[in-house]
């Protein structure tokens, strides 16, 4: 009887110590793969879901949409955007997949512009031109993130005066909303302390 009790206790202890498998998102992502530090700031994965069970996964590294699970014409849930499975992949395989682009989306000719009679020279990271805010644009920065409710995520990034050559301290906010009609509503807001240029967008590949 004593041996049976010992074995029973041992079995219970083993069961208690066995780690539970981490739950994945509907698109198969593990949140732990998005939890690390980049430039001293913590990254994470945030999941939005609506009443139709549409799921949108977003990381605050670059303000990126990582996956979008939405029903296809046959009602089957499919991931319809390109994205990586971890922060490390986004770092080691530089791309604009799903990213919030800033300060200035698209190309600035020769990386130069004049504002209020002041000439500015930006990094020329694309065949002699400045593309998507430079080599360290918003897509490679860590945003502050606040999950407002199950369907809304607020992302905030403050760029300092002179970052990537652009003038002015600027606070940029990106509000991502998953609506109940299966749409993603993205709203941009920027506040600066001196004349500057800003042109933000999202760079998802569908």
Regions found by a protein language model. Name each.
Residues 14-16:
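C-terminal motif of bacterial Sec signal peptides marking the signal peptidase cleavage site
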């Amino acid at each position: 009887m004593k041996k049976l009790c010992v074995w029973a206790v041992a079995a219970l202890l083993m069961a208690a110590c066995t780690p539970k498998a981490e739950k994945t998102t509907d698109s198969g992502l593990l949140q732990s793969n998005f939890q690390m530090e980049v430039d001293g700031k913590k990254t994470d994965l945030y999941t939005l879901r609506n009443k139709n069970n549409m799921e949108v996964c977003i990381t605050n590294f670059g303000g990126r949409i990582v996956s979008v699970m939405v029903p296809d014409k046959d009602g089957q849930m499919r991931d319809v955007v390109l994205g990586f499975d971890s922060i490390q992949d986004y770092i080691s395989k530089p791309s604009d997949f799903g990213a919030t682009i800033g300060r200035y989306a698209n190309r600035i000719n020769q990386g130069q512009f004049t504002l209020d009679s002041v000439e500015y020279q930006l990094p020329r990271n694309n065949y002699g031109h400045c593309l998507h805010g430079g080599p360290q644009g918003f897509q490679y920065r860590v945003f502050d993130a606040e999950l407002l409710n199950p369907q809304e995520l607020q992302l905030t990034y403050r760029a300092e005066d002179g970052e990537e050559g652009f003038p002015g301290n600027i606070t940029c906010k990106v509000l991502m909303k998953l609506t109940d009609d299966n749409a993603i509503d993205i709203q941009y807001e920027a506040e600066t302390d001196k004349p500057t240029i800003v042109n933000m967008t999202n760079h998802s590949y569908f």
